[in-house]
Each structure stands twice: as structure tokens, then as C-alpha cells.
Amino acid sequence: MACTTVNVGSCVWVEDPEVAWIDGEVIEVKGSDIKVKCTSGKTVAIKVSSAYPKDVEAPASGVDDMTRLAYLHEPGVLQNMKSRFDINEIYTYTGNILIAVNPFRRLPHLYNNHMMQQYKGAGFGELSPHPFAVADAAYRQMKNQGISQSILVSGESGAGKTETTKLLMQYLADMGGRAVSEGRTVEKKVLESNPVLEAFGNAKTVRNNNSSRFGKFVEIQFDQRGRISGAAIRTYLLERSRVCQVSDPERNYHCFYMLCAAPPEDIKKWKLADPRKFHYLNQSQCIELERMDDAKEYRETRKAMDVVGINSEEQEAIFQVVAAILHLGNVEFGKGKEADSSAPKDDTSNYHLKTAAELFMCDEQALEDSLCKRVIVTRGETITKCLDQESAALSRDALAKTVYSRLFDWIVNKINDSIGQDPDSEYLIGVLDIYGFESFKTNSFEQFCINLTNEKLQQHFNQHVFKMEQDEYNKEEIDWSYIEFVDNQEILDLIEKKAGGIISLLNEACMFPRATHETFAEKMYQTFKDHKHFSKPKLSRTDFTICHYAGDVTYQTEQFLEKNKDYVVAEHQTLLNASRCAFVASLFPLLAEDANKKSKFSSISSRFKQQLVTLLETLSTTEPHYIRCVKPNNLLKPLIFENQNVLQQLRCGGVMEAIRISCAGFPTRKKFEEFLERFSVLAPEVLDKSTDGWPLSSTDDVACKKLLEKVALQGYQIGKTKVFLRAGQMADLDARRNEVLGRAASRIQRKFRSYLSRKTFLMLRKVATNMQAVCRGQLSRLIFEGLRRDAAVLEIQRDIRMHLARKSYKELYFAAVSIQLGIRGMASRGRLRFQRQDKAAIMIQSHCRKFLAQLHYQRLKKAAITTQSAWRARLARKELRKLKMAAKETGVLEAAKSKLEKQVEELTWKLQLEKRMRTDMEESKTQENAKLRSALEEMQLQFKETKALHLQEVEAAKKMAETVPVLQEVPVVDTELVEKLTSENEKLKSLVSSLDQKIDETEKKFEERSKINEERLKQAIEAETTIVNLKTAVHELQEKILDVESENKILRQKSLIQASGHLPPTPVKGSQNGHFSSKESPFNGSEIETLARTQEQESDAKTRRYHLDRQRENIGALINCVVNNIGFNQGKPVAAFTIYKCLLHWKSFEAERTSVFDRLVQMIGSAIKDEGDNEHLAYWLSNTSTLLFMIQQSLKPGATPQQKTPVSTSLFGRMAMGFRSAPSSAETSAAAEAAAAAVIRPVVAKDPALLFKQQLTAYVEKIFGMIRDNLKNELQTLLSLCIQAPRTSTGRSLRSFRSSKTMRNNSPLDHWNGIYDGLNAILSTLQENFVPPVLIQNIFIQTFSFINVQLFNSLLLRRECCTFSNGEFVKSGLALLEEWCNETTEEYAGSSWDELKHIRQAVGFMVIHKKYRISYDDIAHDLCPILSVQQLYRICTLYWDDSYNTRSVSQDVIANMRVLMTEDSNNADSSAFLLDEDSSIPFSADDLSSSMKEKDFAEMKPAEELEENPAFSFLI
């Protein structure tokens, strides 16, 4: 996709020997030659065809899917990957291919369970690229389409294949796992097989510290429901030579080093030592690895072995064999006694030989002979041949490799047997972890087989990529022609052709004993000298070069023949088959061909070829998914991206070939809305004119077609949803677009300069006008100041004159008032003196009459009480006589009866005494009150007469005053009359004072008597209560007596009938007139006592059964009533109140054993089975929480039962209540509290009640969680649509949203309105069922927290959501939620709005303008103080402005964030950028207690259905 036409100023990519590709700007164009000034500063001259266009509008953070790149070529792909790698985005799509770049550091936040939950059910490409997305897509396709799937993970060593495979298996195990109750053994074994296989099959190489030295294909089998039903692991080509040969700085397999770091007892048992002392390990200086503890890995491997089904005995045997291999490697050989013979070199070798024989559990001499000798069997005899030192060492290494290879195969088979394969499985998902293409300085047989595998897989990959392209074209219904792509079948024929292929020649050479690698190489040179993919290096006689799809690789043939031979030395087979260790013997079983002494030739290459055929057959029956792992640098360090290295891996991984296939067709594919948004400036007239300039009537495809016809572009295709462009056409459109935008920029500049000039002129004109206005204003202000002073002078003169006149008038006024005041005061004092004298006389008379009335009242009251007491005593004695007559027939209850009678007599006597005293007091009080009333009436009459006389005198005085014109002083002549009146007045005063004293004394006595009366009244009430209780007890005893008597009669009749049946028919001597005498009774005394005891036991049992049956009936009636919705009363659930009252009355809280609690728990559990009915759940949440509150109040710690004072219904009780005064407000509140206390009473609870309280608490929490989860599930579908703004027909995001009520009528906010309506619906449901506000608050707080988590995580996982227009859209939706919180009030919403703090701050950052001017401190402390640096970094790197095309934050801010993230990289928690959902229960029973009040239940009524039931009369 090289440039076809370029202009000066165009940005292009040019090749660079150091960084592969470098960008620059075209500064000169001369025909087909151009000059480009690179960003590095140098200027290069190249051909136009060598340059590639650069997309200057590409996001700085790259794109998730590289098929969305405007220019799909090598530099564009490389730049996109580097941009994403710089912001820690290590995963990128290329269509359906996932490219994974190894970050060489741990990023735990990308792989935790929360991240896994995000990808479950999400569409492929909906969230950021991730292995979880590939695994989820494979799983969904398997379930929906019923087709088995495969995921192929490839890449060179160190690219991260093993870790990626682990993630895939972890996700699939979680998706297809069983419930915890069903057991998850299969999934656990599949996951734990990884560390076991890594321990025995992985090693450190030059490129990777944990390189898999074998290929692995894991088949995970599923049943019809999509659950894992079995699994199998297939392995390919274990690198056996590594056991004996290790290059520096590589390591041998991990298990050897783990074993040397085992616990001391294991080291002692297997005679191990430091790894540096073993020959197979000390060939390399690398013994220990950073961040890897071999001792810890040993323990983890043993635990994993336990999980996968390898028992402890087998584990001991495995590590014993591994230890034997280490000791075997330390056996060195020297010259033997005979010529060309060998023997252990020294004592150390003998020690290790002996130790190896002990660990193999075989004969030491036999082991030595098998290493140093060979037995040749001929027809007539057996010949023993000695081996020289070199041959003996090769024999030793061959034994070590064979034993380790057999051990590894045994472990794989054991894992497969333990996991278990499901022959009836419907589908499977295979995960292939295969070695990538390898090309080293020295390439041997292993690299040859690995590259053959990659050739096979590349052919499969190319076919799949071509199929994807074909499916894409068919899906869009466009016309397309056949796409040519490179088929590597010729290379495969060169290698694996049956007759004449390299493998065929290799097998043929291995069958000849005298064949060498030279003869093998010569044979290949002759056979393939004309093959275009085969060549011979000039400076070598035994090497050969194959032109693979990823490049030329030169192989060295020195070890080809030895490594290809797949045989076991007969002596080794015989020796280890005879081992005393059953495990070792099982590794070397006898084979059928060994018995016949004939064996068909077998080679590693043939077997590997057959395995590849089987693998490809399996893959051909599955739908493939590809993950290409890339290693960014060879230093294995983070934050380093080597362009050349990555580009080579992309070529080797087939990614560039896939891009080339895509480029051969239509490499550029743009959705209609994106295409129009970018190129509508080329032909704006093809769009219908509307309010915003975008088409309304025409469709997008028609608009795109008109635009392309307008620009006269050829070869394009219009699909159903996309525009398909040929290679180079995108660059052509961009060039034309740049021209249009350039002309538009010129016009904008012209308009802007005109605007600046006009603005300057208007400013000057405005300044001149302002100066004139200031001058004119100053003159006007001076004139106005003179006028204001003249007016002020006149105002001051008027005020002074007014003040003098007012002062003169006030002096005259106060003099007149003073004179009148003196005259009126003297007259008033005279009247006051006369009124005081009259009042004193009246008071004396009233007190006298009051005293007489009280005496008369007390006498009457005393007589009435005496009469009542005598009558009640008579009734009590009559009742007592009845009770005595009723109790005479039963002797068992005489003691209780006599005791009760005594108590009744004593209490009756006390009651009579109290009543007499009370009657006397009432009579005297009544008499006194009557006397006082009569005296009061007389005094009132006198007062009226006196008042009339006084009024007459006053009127006469007024008339005299009117007749006398002048007031004159009249001397008093009648002094005697004055003295007489004065003396009488003094006598009256003394009489009044004495009466006052008597009255005070009488009042004190009355108060004392009142107190005594109240105390006695209380005692009388208590006595009456006791009498009522005793009467009730006597009544119950009478009922029991009647029952017992009836049962006795029945039993007597039965016994008499039985006795008559056994007696002889002859008459009995002792009978007289049908009766027996006491001495001659038919039954003796012991029989009568036994019969009586039996009768008592039977009656007790019947009584208990009767009570139990009654109790069951009552409990059943209660449950049948409350199981239905019986509504609410006083805002509280009737069912909870009724249950509590019944439990309290039945004393269930104090019972040691009762079934009522179990039945209530079962009833509640069955009532809430319908988890989706919020109305029903809310009703039971209200009932259970209310019942829990009432029980919580009753079962408070340290609570003691209180006796409830019974309400007296007797005549005396009603009279006593009538004498009490009306209650005040304080008494009213106290009465309410007392009534509430009567409803909820503290009790001493037993274990069943405490257990019921715990179960009830659990049900409250469960129902709360069910309602909360229902609301979350309802909102989750809407939240996925609320995070991204809907687009118009041309793809432009809706930008302007209004707040308040108009938003709910706006169609773009339909999904937000759905959330708004859903919240209102659940709120009304909870309110209608009177759920406590504290629970409603917590439901909405957790729901808003869930909304915050979902929206915020979606924002960070989907780049298309981090836009300016989308921020405005989400902000408008959040305004709706804020409006809901304000309307709901804090009582129900609580702090719900604060739970949206993360998404609010993130959206606030997205919609703020001029982000490039904001510093990091402003962002972290002012704009987004709650967000972490990882979250800020992700938002800043993903953000792009789709409305105004402005920049994000500056590069300095990004650099600061990177530094802070690097400092926190060791902290796993701090590196996570996603939020975790909180599903805990945020309240306790104490919270309910604090939110509800006891007095709310004071006036509640029980269920109406139970009021008609006599057994529940206590509820009324």
C-alpha cells in the first residue's frame, strides 16, 4: 500500500536501517522522486513507491483493532503496537487475531477475577483486547453454534505463550466449571496440571526464563450444558538432549533445581547436594533465577501433584528417579583393564554409580555393565563387546535421556487418567501452546522439527485468514475476486514428502549403521539441488538452508541422525524392567517386538510427523482462534520496544502475511458514519440540509456512494455497513481532503483577520464614546451638586422650626397630664382600700363554709364504703362456700385449696379493712364538702349584696361630686364611729388569720390522708389483682378436677367390668346388700394404689397430648394466616406484629424446646422462593426486619421479665380509676411508653429463641441481597447502553443534552430514563411495603455503587467511550440520577449520590476544555482527587476529542504519571485500575434497632382473621 500520489507537506513513512520505519514530512516532489525530512532530523531522497502514507489523525494511543487503521501496512501496524505498548496496552486485535506483547513484568490487575467477570458475555471487540475475550468468544461460539473450537497460541521463546495459555485455561475452567456444591475437581486438575508440566518440561533459555521445551495441546471437553466433563493433554517433541547438555547461560529443567532445594530430609534420603556439584547442572553458570524460589516451587509442585491425582508414593518415586538421573550424570569413565574398554573413573564415580543403582533399585554391577558393555546376539552365539570411554559416556547420556523422556510421558498419561476423558462429550475447546519459529546461530534437529510445525500451522493460518476475508466480503455482500496468497505447500513437500523428502532421506540414513551426517548431507544436496526453497551454504559441507515462510534458516546436520533415532538400548531396557521399584519397572515394560527379537525401525521425525497429522486433523474439525505472542526486546526488560525485533516476529507469526492477504483485497474498511464524518468535506452537497448539516432523508450508503462518485474514485465497493477501498485509495482521499481543508483554513484565516480588524475599530469607537460620556457626566454632576445644596438648606430650616414648636407643645401637655394624674390616683386608692376590706371578709366566710362541707362529705363517704365492703365480704364468703363444696370430692388438691382459701381469707380481710377505712374517709370528706359548699353559697350571696351596696354608694358619691362644684376638705366629726369600725376590723383580721391557720393545718392533714389513701389504694389494687389470679387458678384447678373425675369414672367402670369378668359366678361371702366391707374387698390395697397411679399417668399423658394438639393447631392457624399478604396497620406489617404477640403469649422465647420457630423459618423460606418478584420480596423484607426488631428489643442483654399489671375490671377498680385526676401531657407520653412496653417486653430467652433470631437475621440479609441483585440485574442491561452516546444516521455523537425534566423526554436518554424509572419503581415498591428506611438507603447506596463500578470500568475498557461527546452524554445521564436523589430525599437515598464519585470525576475530566494546559497536580488534587494514578493514566491515554479535535493532556503529564506508576509497580493493589464491586451486607441488627421505635407499635391491631378464633382471644 505504497503512496501513489503525494503532495508537499504530506506525512509519510520511510524505511530506516535502525528503527525499521521512521516518519517524516515531504518537502519536495519531483516526478516519482521525493525528499522527506524525517523526525530524527535527517533528510532522505527516495522513490514515491518506497514511501508509505501516515495517518496524522490516528489516535495517539493507537486503536484496539488494527483493521480499523486508515493505512494497513507494516509501519502503521508497528507504530500502532508501539503506541499501545507505551501506555501498557499489551493486547491488540488484527481482525480476529490477538497480538500479545510480553511486558516482562507482572500486571495483576489485568488478570484478576473482577477483570474476568467483565468479559463474561461481552461481545468480541466490545471491550479492550484480552485473552479472556478470545476465550469467551470460543466458548460462546461452541455453545451457540455447536462447533468445537481451538485456540492456537504461538510465538518465539520468551514471548509469553505459557502465561497466555494459563489465562485461557483459567477462563475456560471458570466458564465451564460446576457449582461449588457439585465439586470442581476436573477444572482444578486442569489448572494444576500447568505447574506440574512446567516443572518437568520448562527450562531457562537465552530468551526466556521459563521456556516450554515441549509442545502442548490441551483438549477441554464439555457436555451439552457447556460444563467441563473431561480433559486431555497431548505433548509434542520434548527436548531430551537438554537433560545431558546445557549451554551457558541456560538451565536444565526446573525439577532438578527444585529437588536440590528440597527439605533436608529429602536431600538426605536421596543423597543430594548443591546443584553446582552435579555434571548435568554445572555445565552452565546459571543456577538460580531472579524472583524464583526453588524451595517454594518444590512445595507448590508437590501440592499440584496432589491435586492432579499423583499420590505421595508416586511422587516419591518420581523425584527418586530424578535424583538417580543427577547421580548418573556424575559417573565419569576412564580406561578399563582391557583394550578399548571403560570403567568408572574414580571413587566419586563409583559412589554416584552405587547411589544411582540404589535409587533405580537395580544391581550396581548390572548398571555398570549396561553402561560399559554391549551384547550382540547372533544366530549361534552371544558376543559381549566393551565400549570405550566416549561410547560409555554416550550410553550414560542415552540412558538419562530415555529415563527422563519415559518419566515425562508417564506424568502426562497420569494427569490424563486422573482428569478423565469424557467419551460422550459434545464439544471441545483445544488450547495449543506450541513453540514459535526458531532461527539461531546453530540450528539442529529440534529447530528443524519446530519449524516444520510452524510451517504446518502457518498453512492452516493462511487458509483461515483467507476464509475470514471471504466471510467478511460475503457478509457485506460485495463483489470480490479471488485473493492470491502464498501457499507454503512446496516447503512442506520438501520436508515431509513420503518419497524424496528430507525426513524420508533422514530415516533412510538412520537405517544404515555406517551412515553419517556427511553422507546424509551429500544425499540431500544431490536430491534437492534444483529446489528453489533448498540451498547449500558456500562455506560448509554438511549444512543446508531451507527458505521458510519467515526467512532462511541454516541447519547443522551433525546431530540429526543420533537425535532422530528412537530406540532404547536392550541392556538398559532389561536392567530397568527388572528393577525392584515397581514405578521404575513400569517405565520400561516388555514390548512384543522385544520378544520376537525383531523391531520395525522407528524415528523421532516419523512419530512427530504423525503427531502433526493428528493435530491438524483435530484442528480442521474445530473453529480456530489465534493468539500471536510477541517479545518486545531480547533483553527481557520492561518498557523497551525494539522495532526490528517485533517486526521480525510479526512476519514469523504470520501477522504480516495476514495483513498482506487483507491488502490484496480491500485493506481499508470504514463504517458509513466514520467515512462520512471524515470525508464529507469533499462533497457536502450530497448531504441533505438539516439543522446540523447532516442527512436526514437519504441513507448513509447512498450518501457514501454519491461522495465517491463525486470524487471519481474507481474500484471501491459499498457493503451493507462499510465502505471497502482498494490499496492507495485512502491516501488519495486524504490528499484531496487535505487540499479542501487547506482552502478552508485559508478562508477561516481571512475571516478571522477581518474579525480582528473590525474588533479593533469597534474598540476604538467605544473608547471615544466613553470619554465623551465621562466629560458630560462630570458637568451634569457639578450642576446637580449646587441644586442639592440649596434644597438641603431649606430642609434644615424647616426641621429647626418644627423642633422648637414641638418642644413648647410637649411642655404644656405634660403639665396638664400631671395634674389629672394626681386627682385620679387619690380617688383610685380610696376605692382599692374598700375593695380589700370586702375581699377579706368574703375569704373568711368561704373558708368556714368549706370546712363544714368537707366534714359532711367525709362522713357520707365513710358510710358508703362500709356498706360496699360488707356486701362484697358476704359475696366472697358465699363464693368461698361454693369452692369448699366443689373441692371436697377431690383429695389430691386439698392442700392447694386450703392454702388458697387462707390466702383468700387474709386478702379478703385486708380488703374489707381497707374498704372500711376508705369508706369512712370518703363519708367525712363528703360531709365536709357539703358544709363547705353551703358556706360558700352563703358567702357568695353576702358578697353579691355587699357588691350591690357598694355600687349604690359609688353612684351616690358620683352624684354628690357632680353637685358640688369645688372639692373642699370636710373635717371628720364622728370619731367614735370610726374607732368602733376600726376595732371590728381588727377583730375580723385576727379571725381571718386564725381561720387561715386552721385551713393550712386542715390542708396538710388532707394531703397526708391523701397519700395514705393512695398507698392503700395501690395495695387494694394489688390485692384485687392477686384475688383475680387466685380465682383464675382455682377455676383452672376446678376444670382439672372435673377432667380427672370424669376420667376416674370411666376408669372405674372399666376396672369393674374387667373385675366382674374374672370373678367366679358364685356369690361372695363378704357382700352385704351389694357392697363389700373394707376387709373383704375384691382388690387389695397395693392393687388399688397401682391402679390409681396408672390412671394418673394416663390422664397426664392425655392432658399433654391435648395441649400439644392444641398448640399445633394454633401454630398452624397462625402460619396459615400470616403466610398470605395480610397488609399493614399504622405503617407496620400486621404479620410480624401478630407473630410476635403469639410468641410472647405462648412464652416461646422462654421454652427449652419448641417447634414454632422451625415452622416459621420454613414458612419464610418457602415464601421467598420466587426470587424475581420484588413486590413479594419487599413485603417479606418488611415483615422479617420488623419481627427482628421486636425480638431484638425483647432479647436485649441483661433483660429481666417484668410483671404486667392486670387491668382491674371490678367495681372497686373502676371507682378507684374514676377518682384519679385527668392526665397531663407528661402523663400521656408516659402512658404511651407504658403501652409500648406492654407490646414489647424484655424476656429471658433460651437457645431456640436465640437461634431463631440468628436465622431471622440471615433471612433479612438474604432478602435484602435478592432485592439488591434483582435491581442490579435489571440495570445492568441498561448500563451497557448508557456508557456510549447513541449516534445519528451519519455517526455524529449527540452532543447537547438538556437537564431537568426535559431530559426525560429526550430520546437519546431513553436508557437513562429506563434507569430513572427502574429506581422509582423499586422505591415505590419498598415504600408501599413499609420497608425500614435504613434498608432502602443501603439498597440504593449499593446500587449506585454498582452503577459507578460498571460505568467506570466500561469507560476504562472501551476506548470508543473515552470521548468528549460521550462524556457529555454520560454527564447528562448522571444529572438525571442527581435529580432522582434530590427528589427521593436523604431519608431514602442517603449518600447514594456520593457513590458515583469515580464516574463523576472521570466524566468531569472528559468534558473539560484545554486539557493540555492542565498540570498533573491540578488533575490529581482538584479535578480527580479520588482517582488513582493508574486510572488517570488510562483515561488520559484513551481519551480523544471527537467533537473539537483538541489534544489530551500534555506529554509531561503523561511522563509524570509513568514515573509514579513505575514507583508503585511492585504493589499489586496499586497497579489495578478497575473498581471492585462490593456485595457485602452493609447493615446490622443494631442499625434496625436504632432506626425504629417501640412506641410505633402501641396502637397496632393484630390480624382480623385470628380475632374470630377463640384460641387467639389474647390478641384483642
From Swiss-Prot:
Myosin N-terminal SH3-like domain sequence ranges: 7-56
Myosin motor domain ranges (all copies): 61-738
Region (Disordered): 1061-1085
Domain Dilute: 1158-1463
Compositional bias of kind Polar residues: 1069-1084
Boundaries of every IQ domain copy: 741-770, 764-793, 789-818, 812-841, 837-866, 860-889
Keywords annotated in UniProt: Actin-binding, ATP-binding, Calmodulin-binding, Coiled coil, Motor protein, Myosin, Nucleotide-binding, Repeat
Record-level Gene Ontology MF annotations: actin binding; ATP binding; calmodulin binding; cytoskeletal motor activity
Annotated residues for binding of ATP: 155-162, 208-216
Coiled coil: 890-1056
Function: Myosin heavy chain that is required for the cell cycle-regulated transport of various organelles and proteins for their segregation. Functions by binding with its tail domain to receptor proteins on organelles and exerting force with its N-terminal motor domain against actin filaments, thereby transporting its cargo along polarized actin cables.
Self-association and partners: Homodimer.
Name of the protein: Myosin-14
Organism for this UniProt entry: Arabidopsis thaliana
Gene label: XI-H
